[in-house]
Design a protein with these regions (language model features):
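ABC transporter nucleotide-binding domains
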Residues: 4, 8-166, 171-185, 189-191
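Alpha-helix boundary recognition
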Residues: 42, 55, 175, 199, ...
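Residues at or immediately preceding the N-termini of alpha-helices
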Residues: 46, 50, 88, 195, ...
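Generic structural signal for individual residues within well-ordered alpha-helical segments
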Residues: 54, 76-77, 92-95, 147, ...
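ABC transporter nucleotide-binding domain
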Residues: 151-240
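Short, charged/small-residue-rich alpha-helical element at the C-terminal edge
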Residues: 204-277, 284
Length: 284
């Protein structure tokens, strides 16, 4: 159940290994058939429209098969011919984006892991797709390689207006790579929200456990002109404005007939939030 991610933004499918991230991406590319339901892209069913839809998508799923005895440019020329990419300018532009030289005698077999990953992303963007699907694009890279990949992913999204769907299990990279987050576990999308919303949910806050959160929300809005709160369920409310007088809020709740059983100041990390949503262990 993959909802509609925003266009011209970078969205991250976040989940532990085996959560269903790669399988979901393969279904979006027609590489795996769903056991039930259907895949729709841009409002159209993928099945029966592959020739129209798939050329508008670039992807990196696992490692592409490059020829080890050819240079990066020579490898891209072969794929360009197969895909009908018209000229060498598209190849040069893709290589420039990922920081690889167009005129280079180094063979693919001599590439470092980071260079191989960059060439794979160059292949994914060479035909100027509208949508990019990148499965674990920073997996196995050193800090410098991660920073480089992060930089041109942001450029594709921010400067070139691409819609990007990334899968990841590295929490520390989320805020640097993604605008929107989807938490996936056992093949189901559990949460889908912007990074700003996610950070607010996992930031420092005051948690009230009480008899009626809907009434508590009305009291906060009416008595304190406050709307920086989130209702978790019928009995738990989070207040994100820490400058408000907690004692006066509790008094107002009680005077209006609410039963307040607990008040806590909480600070939840992104990993804690992930654990709570998935109901399991950490993401690693």
């Amino acid at each position: 159940d993959l909802h509609s991610f925003p266009t011209r933004r970078s969205s991250d499918l976040l989940g532990r290994n085996g959560a269903g991230k790669t399988t979901t991406m393969k279904m979006l590319l027609g590489l795996t058939k769903p056991t039930s339901g259907e895949v729709k892209i841009w409002g159209k069913a993928l099945q029966g429209n592959e020739k129209k839809l798939l050329p508008r998508i670039g992807s990196l799923i696992e490692s592409p098969g490059f020829y080890p005895n050819l240079t990066g440019t020579e490898n891209l020329r072969i794929f360009a011919t197969l895909r009908g990419v018209p000229n060498n300018h598209a190849i040069k532009d893709a290589l420039d984006l990922v920081g690889l030289p167009y005129k280079d005698k180094k063979l693919f077999s001599q590439y470092s892991l980071g260079m191989k990953q960059r060439l794979a992303i160059a292949l994914a963007v060479m035909h100027d797709p509208e949508l990019l699907i990148l499965d674990e694009p920073i997996n196995g890279l050193d800090p410098i390689g991660i920073a480089e990949v992060r930089s041109f992913i942001r450029e594709l999204c921010d400067a070139r207006g691409k819609t990007i769907l990334i899968s990841s299990h590295i929490l520390s990279e989320i805020s640097l790579l993604a605008d929107d987050i989807g938490i996936i576990d056992h093949g189901a999308l559990l949460e889908e929200e912007s990074l700003a919303e996610l950070e607010q949910k996992s930031s420092k806050h005051i948690r009230f456990t009480l008899s009626d959160t809907a009434q508590a929300a009305r009291i906060l809005e009416r008595n304190f002109h406050e709307n920086h709160f989130s209702i978790q369920d019928d009995h738990n409310l989070r207040l994100h404005n820490l400058d408000l007088p907690v004692g006066k809020i509790v008094t107002a709740f009680v005077e209006n007939g609410l039963e307040v059983s607990e008040v806590h100041t909480c600070e939840e990390s992104l990993e804690d939030y992930f654990k709570r949503v998935t109901g399991g262990e950490g993401i690693a």
